[in-house]
Structures are given as C-alpha cells and as structure tokens.
C-alpha cells in the first residue's frame, strides 16, 4: 500500500462505515489523465448497485473537501467480487483454507508470483501452502493478493 493509499484509507474508512459498509480496501492506479481510484466495499448482506452509488456519493463529497489527489481521476466503487482482493491481516485470517494468488514487491526465491492455500496469519506474516511446501510472506512485501474462486 502506498502512502497515498494509506492516507485515503484513513480518510474514507469512517464515512464508509457510517453508511453501514466495510471499506475492504482501495487502489489508486496512476495512468496520467486516466488515473483511477478503485474502492472495494462489503456488507453482511452483500453489495448491489445502489450501495455502490450511495458510497460513491459519500466518497465524492469527502474527496471534494479534502482534495488529496492532485491529478484527474475516475472513481470506481464496487464489491470485492469473486476474486476478492486481500488488503489486511484480517482478510487473510477470514479466508484461511482458500486459494490465493500473491504478487510480491520483492522476489522471494527468484519468484514474485505465487499461488497456494492460505494456512495461517501470524502478526504480519502470512503462511501459504504452495505445491506442498509452506511459504511465508511478510504483508508489507505483498503488492497484490486475490482469492482464486472455486467453481
């Protein structure tokens, strides 16, 4: 998570929670004039288009006042979906036993991309069973992690 993403998460967590939703996480993708702020929300009852619209309006109001992003961007609000992104230690705990795809910031054993089943989370270290071998990844070294849906 970048400094900006951390700042945005802190800024938006309370307004999203006040609306009755969990701020699962967010991503800011820089692409010049086509940058995107993608916000993932969830609730015990799931998420529909009206929920996304409500949160989008609330987030827009906060962003207009705080103005933390200096470039033009598109705001996207969505559910985490089947390939749910994992941002926090609690997310890994919630999905122990599920298959995950992990991309690291810095390679471990000459690899940046890993797939396996989440075994446990201890502090800031997640243990993943990869091809019969348990691997450990520090959360701060994980660039991106998503659940792999089972059909």
Swiss-Prot record:
The keyword Zinc-finger does not apply. It holds the Pfam family DUF150_C. Its main location: cytoplasm. GO terms for cellular component: cytosol. Keywords: Cytoplasm, Ribosome biogenesis. It comes from the Bacteria. It is found in: Cytoplasm. GO terms for biological process: ribosomal small subunit assembly; translation. Required for maturation of 30S ribosomal subunits. Belongs to the RimP family. NCBIfam families: PRK00092.1-1 (NF000927). This is Ribosome maturation factor RimP. It comes from Vibrio atlanticus (strain LGP32).
